[in-house]
Amino acid sequence: MDKGKQIYGIDISKDVYDVCTPEGGLLQFENSEGGFRAFAKAIPKNAHCVMESTGYYHLQLAYFLSDRDFAVSIVNPLKIKRFIQMNLSRIKTDKSDAVWIMKYGASQDLELWEGDSELMQENLQLTRLLSVYIKQSTQLKNKIHGEHTLGNPSKVVVSSLKRQLRSLSKEIKKLEERLGENVRSEHQKSLTLLKGIPGIGEKTAISLIVLTDNFTRFDSYKGLCSYAGITPVIRESGSSVKGRPRISKMGNAKLRNLLFMCSFNACRFNTACRALYERLVAKGKSKKLALIAVCNKLLKQAFSIVRSGLPYDPNHCSVIK
């Protein structure tokens, strides 16, 4: 770590955020533009601000500080939790969180956080809103089906639901078109390469590019698989294994669900994925576990192909272990 940096641990909540100074002092600011300005005035230019990734709450402050040339690092909350456990602390309050974040930052070589470009920020926002609208669309379809099962559905109710569904479908189409235009404007080559992988369609390819920032967020496909939550977790104690191996499910649920849907077509049309699926099923593995392995294989193919810039080759992919 740069010895010239002054570590400030920041614990952020919806309305306020607590700050632990390098000397261990505690400060509190409003989680607002005014609070950001007050904090920026209170710290030196060589301050290194360390905070946990807390959904949306940390982003505004992170961008504010980064835009003003302060060093910013964003840490996975699990790392802070493990750091606290390693130091045998049983007392955990909001203000002590800021202390532990500062201590963690002072003891680690931290990567500097770089904010996304404006286009990338829009792509992520479009992706999140699409997820909301698609979920609402599914709920409306289920509601319409439920009304028809009543035997004598109200025409007023059904008409209203259908109007809402049509309106939502139009919005989904607009957002998908905008997202596609954005991705094609910067990552057309990657999009073409991904669509060349049997089992991966255009929507999935676009989502992969957006969620992984064109596969630049990860140094290896293993890190990407962990992010997707499709790595196996084995629970064991001593020499005894407690239960079957399961996937972690701690990663990005959207990415995991997309891959799972793609795995069905991949088993039919992707040479390597089909061979893997058939081999695992022949060994007595469950079909679901085999499909998860196919998800892992698909993600490995996608990572390798985009990073290398080489198109899909069934003969090459079939020997990837």
Question: Language model features by range: what are they?
Answer:
Residues A47-Y57:
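Short glycine-rich phosphate-binding loop at a beta-alpha junction
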Residues P198-E202, L224:
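Small-residue hinge/turn detector
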Residues F29, G34, L208-K283, K287, ...:
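Phosphate-backbone recognition surface of nucleic-acid-processing proteins
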Residues A272-K321:
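Acidic, carboxylate-rich catalytic segments that either coordinate divalent cations
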